[in-house]
Design a protein with these regions (language model features):
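A "functional boundary" signal
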Residues: 2-313
Length: 318
């Protein structure tokens, strides 16, 4: 776990990325309160708005709450499904069901997601919803594989034929070139071609925003890790973690891996601080993978942190 500690030298660029993340964490409560206020403002008008505005308000509520509060996201989607419009509009109904499956997947209800997706008839899935459909299947498959590899203490061999087939479907139905580049990059990663993945994704990273920027940033981190560039691995994990904090997402994807990376180079204080950051938010969404990662890392890093603190106190008293 500390294999890189003796030989690693951090670049100024990566040190700045970590500093920016530290600053973002200091302001985390402000970011979350700001988003929570926006969510509450929409909740407060739901019962008073015109009928023709209700579904749009619920959609806006979902878009704000998704990746911040799973419970609020599910409530918004259920409100949509309860409307007469959802009973008449197949696209609206199926879209809400697919987004609901996405939320359940983050929560860790992988079996529920599989059943929900099987219950949606293929003829009811429009081309627009097919992007969401394959995206949900793919993410659920990856999360389930990650969960199983943690439980069974075995590594994912990266040659998952199902995952590759799902990526092909995502690439085929994706109309946005930036999103398509993200999935092509992930495919190259799965095929063990990190340099190809970096070449595909780098031009799109600067053009991306929101969730797709997070996706590309995390994939870039994986590519750098595969290439053996520890400094760049940490850099991209720090940048995507900062984006999560600033945009008030609490289902952290990069930060658990960043904690592991920092521990591996002997950055115990930062690893501990980021672990505490995740602990504070572990029940907001909630996310099963995040809870598992925190539970996995906390005992080891907490013990090392306490040993370091005890050593510092002894040195200060001399």
């Amino acid at each position: 776990f500390c294999a890189f500690a003796q030989s690693f030298s951090m670049s100024p660029e990566t040190e700045k990325a970590l500093h920016d993340l530290d600053v973002a964490i200091e302001n985390k409560k402000e970011y979350q309160e700001r988003l929570s206020e926006r969510i509450d403002s929409i909740k407060n008008v739901l019962d008073k708005c015109r009928k023709d505005e209700y579904v749009d308000n619920c959609k806006q509520l979902f878009n704000l709450a998704f990746h911040y509060s799973g419970r609020a996201s599910l409530n918004a989607l259920q409100n949509i499904l309860n409307t007469p419009e959802a009973k008449q509009d197949t696209d609206l109904r199926v879209g809400a069901q697919l987004h609901m499956a996405s939320v359940y997947s983050v929560m860790g209800l992988y079996g529920v997601v599989i059943r929900m997706l099987r219950n949606i008839e293929e003829k009811d899935i429009s081309d627009v919803n097919k992007q969401i459909y394959y995206h949900t299947i793919y993410n659920n498959h990856v999360r389930l594989a990650t969960y199983e590899s943690n439980i069974l203490s075995r590594a994912d061999d990266g040659t998952d034929s199902v995952r590759l087939a799902l990526l092909d479907s995502l690439i085929a139905y994706q109309t946005d070139p930036v999103s398509k580049a993200a999935y092509k990059g992930e495919k190259a990663l799965l095929q063990g071609e990190p340099d190809k993945a970096i070449a595909i994704m780098t031009p799109s990273l600067g053009k991306s925003t929101g969730l797709i920027k997070l996706r590309i940033g995390y994939a870039m981190a994986q590519a750098e890790m595969q290439s053996g560039n520890v400094d760049k691995w940490i850099y991209y994990l720090a940048k995507t973690s900062e984006q999560d904090i600033v945009e008030a997402r609490t289902d952290y994807k990069s930060m658990p891996e960043l904690v592991q990376a920092l521990y591996s180079i002997g950055e115990i204080d930062r690893a501990y601080a980021y672990l505490v950051c995740m602990l504070e938010d572990a029940n907001i969404f909630p996310s099963r993978l995040l809870e598992m990662e925190v539970a996995h890392h906390f005992p080891l890093i907490n013990t090392k942190y306490e040993v370091n603190e005890a050593y510092k106190r002894r040195m200060d008293s001399m």
